[in-house]
Amino acid sequence: MKEKISKIDKNFYTDIFIKTSFQNEFEAGGVIPPIAKNQVSTISNKNKTFYSLAHSSPHYSIQTRIEKFLLKNIPLSASSFAFRKERSYLHYLEPHTQNVKYCHLDIVSFFHSIDVNIVRDTFSVYFSDEFLVKEKQSLLDAFMASVTLTAELDGVEKTFIPMGFKSSPSISNIIFRKIDILIQKFCDKNKITYTRYADDLSFSTKKENNILSSTFFINEISSILSINKFKLNKSKYLYKEGTISLGGYVIENILKDNSSGNIRLSSSKLNALYKALYEIKKGSSSKHICIKVFNLKLKRFIYKKNKEKFEAKFYSSQLKNKLLGYRSYLLSFVIFHKKYKCINPIFLEKCVFLISEIESIMNRKF
C-alpha cells in the first residue's frame, strides 16, 4: 500500500493543478467554471456512451495533473485490476485458475451510476478546508468542476463522472474501494475468490462449495453494491462449472477437481488474424486484406496525384500495425506464463507459432 498522502492546500492546487489553466479567470477573482458541453464529444458504441474531452480544454490539462499528482497516489483495493499500471486482464483472471466453480456479475451503467455526492465525500479528505477563490469556490468544488460533466443522461439533466474522461477510471477505482473491501470480507468468510475489472466482478470456489449458484450469494452482493447505489445487471448473471468464457478469455479446469486450471483464448478471438495470415499466403494485397478482414477503409478525399501509391502505402502501414498489435498481444501471454504458469499449454504453443509467423511476414513483406 502507498504511503498516506498529505492534504492538498490552496498553494499546491494553484501551482500544480491549475498552473496556466484558467489563468485569466483566476487572476480576475473568478471561479473555475464547469466543463462546457461544447468541449465534449459524445461517442455511442452499442449500449454505451463515451465522452471525449477536447485536449484544448483547460480542464483536460487539469485532469492530467490531477491524475498524476493525486489519483495515482491514492491506495486501491487488492481486488481491483482495471486501469492500473502493471495489471492486466490476465492478472484479473489468474486467481480463479485454482478453482472449479465460476460466477461472473456485471454492474449496470458503472461509471454513470457513480453518485457525485459520494465522490465529494470520498475526496473531501484529500483537500484542505480552504477556498480557492475567496468565499466563492472551495478546493473540493474546483476539483469537482474539473472531473464531472453536467449533461442529459437517459433523458434527464444530471451531473456525473463521464466514461471516457482521463480522470474517470482512477476515480471509479477509488470510489469502489469501500465496496471491494466489503465484498472481499464476505468472500473470505465464505471461501470465495474475488476479483474486479471495472464493472466486471468475478468469483470462484472449490468443487465442494455451492454458494455461487445460490440466491443468498446474489442478494448479499446486491446488498453490498447498493451501499454506493450500484445495481447488478441480473440478466448478465453467469454461473459455470469447469469452464467459463469472459470476453473471449477462457478459464478452464477440465478435470473439475481441485488441481490448477489454465487460461486460453477462444478460437473466435483470433479469427481475424488467421484470415489475414491466410490472405497473405495467398498473395492478396494489403488493401484487400484491410478491407475484407479488418473492415479498414480509406476515407474519401480529393487526390492531387499518385492515388494508387498513396493507397498502397496507407493499407500497407495499416496491415503492418495490425500484425504488430497481434504480435504484442500474443507475446503478453508468453511473458505472463513465465511468471504465473497458468496459460493453457496447447494455446501457448499456438502463440509461439503465430508470433513466429508474424515475424517471418514482417521480414519478407515490410
Which residues fall in each region the model found?
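Right-hand nucleic-acid polymerase module
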Residues: 1-132, 143-165, 174-184, 211-366
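Beta-propeller folds
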Residues: 135-139
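Catalytic palm active-site di-aspartate
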Residues: 104-108, 164, 168, 190-208
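Conserved hydrophobic residues forming the short capping helix/wall of the S-adenosyl-L-methionine
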Residues: 187
